[in-house]
Amino acid sequence: MTNEVKENTPLLNAIGLKKYYPVKKGLFAKPQQVKALDGVSFQLERGKTLAVVGESGCGKSTLGRLLTMIEEPTKGELYYKGHNFLENDSETKALRRKKIQIVFQNPYASLNPRKKIGSILEEPLIINTKLSAKERREKVLSMMEKVGLRAEFYDRYPHMFSGGQRQRIAIARGLMLDPDVVVADEPVSALDVSVRAQVLNLMMDLQDELGLSYVFISHDLSVVEHIADEVMVMYLGRCIEKGTTEQIFSNPQHPYTKALLSATPRLSPNLRRERIKLTGELPSPINPPKGCAFNPRCWKATEKCRENQPHLEQHTDGKLIACFHID
């Protein structure tokens, strides 16, 4: 690995990431593949938030698992400050663990119920650093203060906390190694509405204080509008539209993006959109439709859409769109 980093090099650069899962239906059946992720590319700058949105099954959580190397991609490239993050040498593995962390969706399942909070937060330091016991405890207490947890919580168990407090613990654990990138996989969807805003505001404050970059995975577009700098809309394993938050919310172009936004409640009557009701379900990733994957549900679909797959193309405003019928 080289330490030379060009000034304009993005913090994280994903190129054509793919994840295919083999499926066997019988001894003599032809092998099939589930294309959970099929060629996703993006760049993430320091201190910015990229939101990844779409229906369940679109591949957004799979993307998060690939970025943190919980699973290895079938194909593609991933670079951190220009360094190949898919290499398996010990130096790259150690750097990966420190620089990219994840906060999972369910704070009730992501914390070990048999361990005290102090032990949960110390574990990354024990594995990845050479800090003394005193230094580890000091770092844990400092991080607990940052996320709004009192010092006396150090010796308590996860079941003693509310959902919002548990997610604060999960966020603290993700930040113990001072990462640059945090993958937040639906971090507030399992929480009560009353505490969602508190956790989101905490994440934004930590981003400002620590210079964090987020890959924010969500299906809640009202949350995305509040926190994201850029939005990537996914459908059946592919990116179909990507742009700044303002571009996506003020002028969506892909029919699927329009349908998603039409279902999002708006406070101002002037901002409300005509509701677009999609028919049918998300197609099977084992047997996706020919041409554009969205064509069976799209009111704009033509023969061209049913025969050809549109590629993601950049338009004059910088937005990326994969559709033959742009307004």
Swiss-Prot record:
Transport as UniProt keyword: yes
InterPro entries the UniProt entry points to: AAA+_ATPase, ABC_transp_ATP-bind, ABC_transporter-like_ATP-bd, ABC_transporter-like_CS, Oligopep_ABC_C, P-loop_NTPase
Gene Ontology MF terms in the entry: ATP binding; ATP hydrolysis activity
UniProt-annotated binding residues for ATP: G54, E55, S56, G57, C58, G59, K60, S61
Catalytic activity of the protein: a dipeptide(out) + ATP + H2O = a dipeptide(in) + ADP + phosphate + H(+)
Cellular-component GO terms for this entry: plasma membrane
Keyword check for Magnesium: no
Pfam families for the chain: ABC_tran, oligo_HPY
Keywords, in A-Z order: ATP-binding, Cell inner membrane, Cell membrane, Membrane, Nucleotide-binding, Peptide transport, Protein transport, Translocase, Transport
GO biological process: peptide transport; protein transport; transmembrane transport
Family: Belongs to the ABC transporter superfamily.
NCBIfam families: oligo_HPY, PRK11308.1
Functional description taken from the UniProt entry: Part of the ABC transporter DppBCDF involved in dipeptide transport. Responsible for energy coupling to the transport system.
Entry protein name: Dipeptide transport ATP-binding protein DppF
